[in-house]
């Protein structure tokens, strides 16, 4: 697990106490892409949390982005999100 993936996991676990959290590093799919410089920059997150109950899909994405905002500005180029309540 890369340091970026560890940071991402720690942030999401602390903020959402998920019942399910999977993080896939998809950086290898973007080799040669300008945003892929340095590797470990493209991630797919699947997260299930009670915090998402009654929250629209757009709002769930905003919550996830807010939890990792500083990482998106510096280390993570792309984040695909599947967020849902249990």
Where are these regions (language model features)?
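A short, structured beta-strand/loop element
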Residues: 31-49
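Solvent-exposed beta-strand sheet faces enriched in polar/charged residues
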Residues: 24, 46-48, 82-84
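C-terminal structural segments of small proteins and small subunits
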Residues: 53-86
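Conserved beta-strand core positions
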Residues: 19-21, 43, 79
């Amino acid at each position: 697990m890369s340091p970026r993936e560890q940071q991402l996991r720690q942030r999401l676990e602390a903020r959402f106490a998920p019942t399910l959290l999977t993080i896939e590093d998809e950086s290898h799919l973007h080799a040669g892409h300008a945003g892929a410089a340095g590797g470990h920059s493209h991630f797919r997150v699947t997260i299930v949390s009670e915090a998402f109950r009654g929250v629209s899909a757009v709002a769930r994405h905003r919550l996830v982005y807010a939890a990792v905002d500083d990482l998106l500005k510096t280390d993570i180029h792309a984040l695909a999100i599947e967020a849902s309540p249990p």
